[in-house]
UniProtKB/Swiss-Prot annotation:
Gene that this polypeptide is encoded by: Lcp2
Signal peptide: 1-16
Highest taxon in the source lineage: Eukaryota
Record-level GO cellular component terms: chitin-based extracellular matrix
Record bears the keyword Cytoplasm: no
Keyword annotations from UniProtKB, A to Z: Cuticle, Signal
Name of the protein in its database record: Larval cuticle protein 2
InterPro entries, A to Z: CHIT_BIND_RR_consensus (IPR031311), Cuticle_Struct_Prot (IPR050468), Insect_cuticle (IPR000618)
Organism annotation: Drosophila melanogaster
Residues in Chitin-binding type R&R domain copies: 39-100
GO MF annotation, one: structural constituent of chitin-based larval cuticle
GO biological process, one term: chitin-based cuticle development
Described purpose of this protein according to its UniProt entry: Component of the larval cuticle.
Length: 126
């Protein structure tokens, strides 16, 4: 339950801090909202008139699966799916930045180092 509250807080803060580019965002209405909290987990969802969406499901073990999304200032639908479990928060989506590929020379150097471990050091006596 703690993870659920934390994730909703993060989503809420991110939504609150996002720059508002359209005047109708200020007057967005909640079109639908559902919260079902049970002993074995929960389900929740939210949909607003300006395109903000959120849905999450959790189980009694603290595992949560969900997604959230909004309409960008460019008019594109941004969606992030996530899993939160014993391995932490794991977001995925086309909008999540990815690191650039490792340069070929670096990859070769790492492969060489892995195939040639250093010789064991012998203690020196004085």
């Amino acid at each position: 339950m703690f993870k659920f509250v934390m994730i909703l807080a993060v989503v809420g803060v991110a939504t609150a801090l996002a720059p508002v580019s359209r005047s109708d965002d200020v007057h967005a209405d909640v079109l639908s909202r559902s919260d079902d909290v049970r002993a074995d987990g929960f389900d929740s969802s939210l949909h607003t008139s300006n395109g903000i969406e959120q849905a999450a499901s959790g189980d009694a073990h603290g595992n949560i699966h969900g997604n959230f999304g909004w309409i960008s200032p460019e008019g594109e639908h941004v969606e992030v799916k996530y899993v939160a479990n014993e391995n932490g928060y794991q977001p995925s989506g086309a909008w999540i930045p990815t690191p650039p590929p490792i340069p070929e020379a670096i990859a070769r150097a790492v492969a060489w180092l892995e195939s040639h471990p250093p010789a064991p050091e012998h203690p020196r006596h004085h």
